[in-house]
Amino acid sequence: VSPKPFASARSTSAQGFTFFPPELASQAEFEGLSPNGDLQGADELLRERYFRRIHGYPANASTDRELVALILEKARRIVSHPTRPTFSEVLPYTQAPFEELALEESLDEDPTLDAVEALRVERQRERRVRCVAMLDTSSSMAGEKHLLASVAVAVLLLEMPPEDAGLCVFSTGARVVRRLGERKSAQATVLDFLRTTPKGFTDISLGLRKGHEEAVRSGSSARSVGILVSDGRSTEGDDPLPLARRFRTLVVLHLDGPGSDLAASQALAQAGGGTCLVVDDFADLPRRLYDAVRLVLRR
């Protein structure tokens, strides 16, 4: 039995005109996409290789490796210096004799600093944060948007430790591309994402459910955060708000444009205890995902 749709696939404006969601128009236009169009922020060689692939040119391991390498190169220009959040812990000197002396804490223990066992040192440790990204791969994400989304995926993989980055995709269905705790290479993950053909409608609730299930499965839901990449407009499925509330923190990257619903994206972020970052130009998606990951790591 099909689930009750949360939003109608066809809507009527206040003026009485009937319009269809972007998925329907994009599905019809997908085969006609031209590799001669404009793609801001992407190298021409990258763009050429991508469109040759989706237009049916023979693909093999060599051409796939070349395309993935170009995507990762593009991502590295955004993630120039990966950052890792840290926190300080104070330990007895005898446990970590090569760390920096914590003078104030040592004086509290022994004002004379004569007793070695009273000395304290400070050590920086990496704070583990696990992140599940959920990307819309409906028909409205076809072509150039799919290419830019693959660069955004690469940004996530370069910025996060391998075992702390999970990736789900959703449209009419949903699947996990990379599991939390899995040490799948960035190259294999990007290629797997590229093999996901954008199609179908947008079921945000299904994407959120799949992402949260992955966080629970990994046993780290209490310290996992979600990043949802969507235009906020569900065209099928259930109300996504109850699913957003399951996350400890949910950051929403709102893809602004015709037919998008900023208010819905903001409501999802609020329900998930996070924030909504607006992507005004789709070419900015990789960098805005970088901003989102850095925001997540600082929490």
Model segments located where?
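Acidic/polar low-complexity segments with low predicted structural confidence
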Residues: V1-R128, S185-A186, P286-R288, A292
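Short glycine/proline-enriched coil/turn segments at helix->beta-strand junctions
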Residues: P111-D114, V129, P161-P162, R246-T249
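Von Willebrand factor
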Residues: E126-E182, A186-V229, R233-E236, ...
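Short, hinge-like loop/turn segments at secondary-structure boundaries
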Residues: R183-Q187, L268-A271, R294-L297
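Extended, charge-rich low-complexity interaction segments
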Residues: L191-L208, D280-R298
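VWA/integrin I-like adhesion module and closely mimicked acidic/polar interface patches used
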Residues: G232-G272, L277-D280, Y290-D291
